[in-house]
Amino acid sequence: MPVYALSEAICFPDPSLARADGLLAVGGDLSPERLLNAYCMGIFPWYSEGEPILWWSPNPRLILIPSRFHMSSSLKKTLRQKRFAVTLDTAFKDVMAACAAVRQDHGEGTWIVPEMEKAYRRLHQAGFAHSVEAWQDGELAGGLYGVSLGRGFFGESMFFKRSNASKAAFAVLVEFLTAHEFEFIDCQMKTPHLMSLGAEERPRSVFLDMLHQTLEFPTLRGRWSLESENGLA
């Protein structure tokens, strides 16, 4: 399969045309309009410093159904003991920076390049991108961020500085999404960590059907909060 070169037009080729490794297209930009269009088609950007923008739609796709979230006994104990104070949308920029820094500290390199940080901060300001923060002793101990459209949440990255911090943040996110009738969390690609939390692979065609159905519902847009009934601050 060829890799498609994007033009200035905010459109993408059919995801089914992606290569076997999931790579679909190259180029374009990270404007809010293009990013939202990509997510609505089951496509996401992923590239490293010095590379052009690469757009992916892997097959199979890793997703987590909130009702199938697996909580280990150690995580249950962590939540029961309230080791972390978890918040939503209070430190988006810091969470993104921490996700990038943790990977660099481990020598992994990061795809959260400055251009990507700016793009997702714009989505956050527009009410589409959200962060979950786990705090301990007033310090950011772990967290994650992603994008919300319809009744789908598209996870992007997570980090932890203290044991179980990111899992605690994820557990609170699952509880929040369940309360607001979200249908899935898109985890993108398979990892042992996500599989241990209950994520499962689905054929891309099945994922896209689920995506199209969930986009029929309104997006919970704005700053999220655990304190209000409607989920918004």
Curated annotation (Swiss-Prot):
Keyword Cytoplasm set for record: yes
Gene expressing this chain: aat
The family this protein is said to belong to: Belongs to the L/F-transferase family.
Record's function text: Functions in the N-end rule pathway of protein degradation where it conjugates Leu, Phe and, less efficiently, Met from aminoacyl-tRNAs to the N-termini of proteins containing an N-terminal arginine or lysine.
Major enzyme class: transferase
A cellular-component GO term for this protein: cytoplasm
Main subcellular localisation: cytoplasm
E.C. number(s) listed in UniProt: 2.3.2.6
InterPro entries for the chain: Acyl_CoA_acyltransferase, Leu/Phe-tRNA_Trfase, Leu/Phe-tRNA_Trfase_C, Leu/Phe-tRNA_Trfase_N
Signal in keyword set: no
Entry protein name: Leucyl/phenylalanyl-tRNA--protein transferase
Any one of the GO BP annotations: protein catabolic process
Coiled coil: none
Any GO molecular function: leucyl-tRNA--protein transferase activity
Catalytic reaction list: N-terminal L-lysyl-[protein] + L-leucyl-tRNA(Leu) = N-terminal L-leucyl-L-lysyl-[protein] + tRNA(Leu) + H(+); N-terminal L-arginyl-[protein] + L-leucyl-tRNA(Leu) = N-terminal L-leucyl-L-arginyl-[protein] + tRNA(Leu) + H(+); L-phenylalanyl-tRNA(Phe) + an N-terminal L-alpha-aminoacyl-[protein] = an N-terminal L-phenylalanyl-L-alpha-aminoacyl-[protein] + tRNA(Phe)
UniProt KW keywords: Acyltransferase, Cytoplasm, Transferase
Domain of life of the native organism: Bacteria
Subcellular localization: Cytoplasm
Species the sequence originates in: Desulfatibacillum aliphaticivorans
